[in-house]
Amino acid sequence: MQKGIEVDWLLNYRGGSFLIYYNQNIENELKIRGVSYQVVADAKVNLILTEIANPEVNMDIIKLEKTPKIAVYSPKSKLPWDDAVTMVLTYAEIPYDVIYDEEVIGGKLPEYDWLHLHHEDFTGQYGRFWANYRGASWYQDDVRNQENMAKKLGFNKVSQMKLGVAQNIKNFCSGGGFLFAMCSGTDSYDIALAAAGIDICERMFDGDGITPNAQSKLDFSQTFAFQNF
């Protein structure tokens, strides 16, 4: 695509394949990089397209018209686990920028076409680690960094900052941006949106208790995918 060559993405065909016109330079590149490929005749292409067009199969074709500008929502500090998304993108030599709360709150999201996120707790409770790792230096550093950033950006609590991030991401998607979320980035995201305006964080996370009857005050009309949690 960067070289102006048309590419079709064959969704769910052989695990998700790409269809391009034959090009010797591309074939050489595939060989060098160890990418599996198959050269097919026009008749075979027509059979593939016919198979994908069958309404009884869960397949589709998307024409890729531009190289998307990709952002990965990931903390700048080092945590005990690897960021799988950035590892894959780096290995595949796909350009991307790493952004986090400051960039999102600062209005940077509209500069991108695609946003990836995964290991994140948008509720402001620092993931599932408090019970076992609250004494670990990496956990304490993360809490300190998050609290300092919240204050820098004008928020009283980390949970309020994370809600602001979640709402900015929601607006990004409403404006046509693509979001790929996985791991805790999926469910904690909707929990934060549903809990807007109420406090669901216990004292050990933000210094005060939760809003009375917080469960009954969740607004599931604000979520993307989940409800009744």
Which ranges hold each PLM region?
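Intrinsic-disorder/low-complexity accessory segments
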Residues: 1-173, 201, 205-208, 220-228
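Short, contiguous, pocket-lining structural segments
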Residues: 161, 180-181
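A short helix->loop->beta-strand "cap" motif at the edges of active sites that frequently abuts
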Residues: 175-177
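An acidic, glycine-rich "communication" segment
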Residues: 182-229
